[in-house]
Amino acid sequence: MAVSIRLARGGAKKRPYYRIVVADARSPRDGAFIEKIGAYNPLLAKDDPKRVVLDTDRAKHWLSVGAQPTDRVARFLDAAGVQERAARSNPKKAEPGEKAKERAEERAAKLAAAEEAANAPAEEPAAEPAAEEVTEVAAEAPAEEAAAEESTEA
């Protein structure tokens, strides 16, 4: 017979209260159980000592007999120091998706182009002759205007 240590839900609607029970794995969640070894009240504060109440001696006994705890109960057992929980590692979960990678590459390309433009030597020598040409044109314009004024006066 496969035995598991799991939570059996009790309490009213929207007011959950769980018993930590040892039960046959084939029995319903809230159905028959072999032994109640604790309680879990998720409505209490996380630092409240009554949030998880566990009979560690009975939990150790059932684990030695071969009972398999569910994930949530395994967390409680780990917190109580009864059984160490295996650390899970899923590095692919944190890896960004394909579209996010494409956006990051585009952003990196834009930044690289902006840095190249900023680091490239500015074309100041080419800009200075253009400024000189404008001053020369401006110097010629008053002479032409003066000539135009003289011709209209005559």
From Swiss-Prot:
GO terms for cellular component: cytoplasm; small ribosomal subunit. Residues 92-109 have a biased composition (Basic and acidic residues). InterPro entries: Ribosomal_bS16, Ribosomal_bS16_CS, Ribosomal_bS16_dom_sf. Residues 142-154 have a biased composition (Acidic residues). Keywords: Ribonucleoprotein, Ribosomal protein. GO terms for molecular function: structural constituent of ribosome. It holds the Pfam family Ribosomal_S16. Residues 110-129 have a biased composition (Low complexity). One of its GO terms (biological process) is translation. Residues 82-154 are annotated as: Disordered. NCBIfam families: S16. PANTHER family: 30S RIBOSOMAL PROTEIN S16 (PTHR12919), SMALL RIBOSOMAL SUBUNIT PROTEIN BS16M (PTHR12919:SF20). Belongs to the bacterial ribosomal protein bS16 family. This is Small ribosomal subunit protein bS16. The gene is rpsP.
